[in-house]
């Protein structure tokens, strides 16, 4: 792969990974400080084909009071704008670091609101040594599904914009903070979580990370899907193991798992006082590069894990877990002009149960994306994408909702 593409991809991972690597660095006493980040913006053109869709659908729908199915926005893509600082030092034979980052965004579709929101997705410390591994304490990207997300080619672009998920509006016309990319159409969002995690040393390409993470509440409307509120007396548990290899045929294979005891589930079919249930998920993936061709395959399955976001619509209104599964296939090719061309297909499915069979609940969200990513410099990339998103309902009388999305823009890493 050409060095320009390597730098671009490395920059993408840099903005999403745990500890930043060599952006702008300087020494401050015993510490080395690194500042890095990215800025992007895209012109997004959306054509929502339908006025209604299933709950949990990611194909945006027309608003009931709007005759025009088209919408436009200027927004950040999948990655928010990013500014991160990492300070590292080695004392008493221990490598230590602290990372804090900020995420201002370009979204917003109304006056006097400042044009989007700001986030604080990372604030953590690490300590360790290459002989025994490292420990992370604080808020960072979750472990489960993180590698699937970082290998998604739409990370540098827009992908899906989102439908009735999230704020329940057409994201592409609302000026939402970020777009969805392949989240919910191929993998569950890893999210940003408080955690204590241990990562092994690199053992000839083998790495493993296990950790306890902040337990999530289940998300639902309590009519179609149960929801939970309040705290939990147990953590969530996540882990991932991977093996990487180099040479003419480079690549990485990984497996992962998630488990949480979800407490205080409430719904119309649950007795007063709520109930508890287990949520679990498993994943496997592989990504390879041969000359200028990149291939990625990923799959996951869950019980109670839900779809799009972890524990979102994972339980029916009686508190019973729903099964979910999905994955994506992706192929990219770097031309002699350094343009990275890619195509990806992803799908996420959510089963219904006996208690809610045939309701207007999302059965499947799928997406196909074709994209072109052209580096102008080591750090600046022009992006053009087209995505088609479909959402299918368990309700037989509800037609599938469809959306076409075109986007052009630029992203710069430093």
Question: For the regions a protein language model found, what residue spans apply to each?
Answer:
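Outer-membrane beta-barrel "beta-signal"
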Residues: 376, 402-414
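Transmembrane beta-strands of outer-membrane beta-barrel proteins
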Residues: 33-41, 96-100, 135, 206-210, ...
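Outer-membrane beta-barrel channels and translocator barrels
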Residues: 2, 28-30, 90-92, 130-133, ...
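Outer-membrane beta-barrel architecture
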Residues: 84-86, 124-127, 197-199, 240-242, ...
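Outer membrane beta-barrel
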Residues: 24-45, 67-218, 233-235, 243-245
């Amino acid at each position: 792969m050409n060095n320009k593409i390597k730098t671009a991809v490395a920059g993408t991972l840099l903005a999403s990974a745990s500890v930043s690597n060599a952006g702008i660095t300087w020494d401050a006493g015993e510490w080395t400080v690194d500042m890095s980040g990215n800025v992007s913006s895209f012109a997004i053109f959306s054509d929502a084909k339908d006025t209604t869709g299933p709950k949990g659908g990611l194909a945006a729908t027309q608003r009931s009071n709007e005759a025009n199915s088209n919408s436009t926005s200027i927004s950040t893509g999948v990655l928010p704008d990013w500014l991160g600082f990492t300070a590292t030092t080695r004392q008493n034979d221990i490598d230590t670091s602290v990372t804090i980052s900020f995420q201002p965004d370009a979204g917003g579709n109304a006056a006097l609101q400042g044009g989007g929101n700001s986030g604080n997705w990372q604030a953590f410390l690490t300590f360790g040594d290459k002989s025994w591994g490292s420990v992370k304490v604080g808020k960072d990207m979750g472990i489960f599904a993180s590698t699937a997300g970082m290998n998604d080619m739409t990370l540098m672009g827009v992908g899906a914009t989102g439908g009735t998920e999230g704020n329940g509006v057409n994201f592409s016309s609302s000026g939402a903070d970020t777009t969805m990319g392949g989240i919910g159409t191929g993998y569950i969002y890893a999210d940003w979580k408080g955690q204590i995690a241990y990562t092994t040393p690199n053992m000839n390409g083998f790495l493993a990370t296990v950790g306890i993470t902040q337990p999530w509440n289940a998300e639902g409307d309590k009519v179609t899907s149960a929801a939970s509120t309040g705290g939990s007396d147990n953590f969530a548990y996540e882990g991932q193991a991977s093996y990487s290899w180099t040479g003419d045929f480079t690549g990485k294979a990984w497996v992962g798992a998630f488990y949480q005891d979800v407490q205080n589930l409430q719904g119309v079919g649950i007795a007063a006082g709520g109930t508890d249930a287990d949520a679990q998920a498993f994943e496997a993936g592989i990504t390879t590069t041969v000359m200028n061709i990149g291939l990625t395959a990923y799959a996951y399955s869950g019980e109670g894990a839900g779809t799009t976001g972890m524990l979102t619509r994972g339980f029916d209104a009686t508190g019973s877990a729903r099964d979910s599964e999905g994955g994506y296939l992706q192929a990219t090719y770097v031309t002699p002009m350094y343009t990275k061309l890619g195509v990806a297909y992803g799908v996420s499915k959510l089963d219904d149960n006996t208690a809610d069979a045939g309701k207007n609940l999302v059965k499947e969200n799928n997406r196909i994306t074709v994209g072109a990513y052209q580096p102008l410099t080591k750090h600046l990339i022009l992006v053009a994408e087209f995505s088609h998103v479909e959402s299918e309902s368990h309700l037989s009388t509800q037609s599938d909702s469809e959306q076409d999305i075109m986007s052009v823009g630029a992203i710069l890493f430093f």
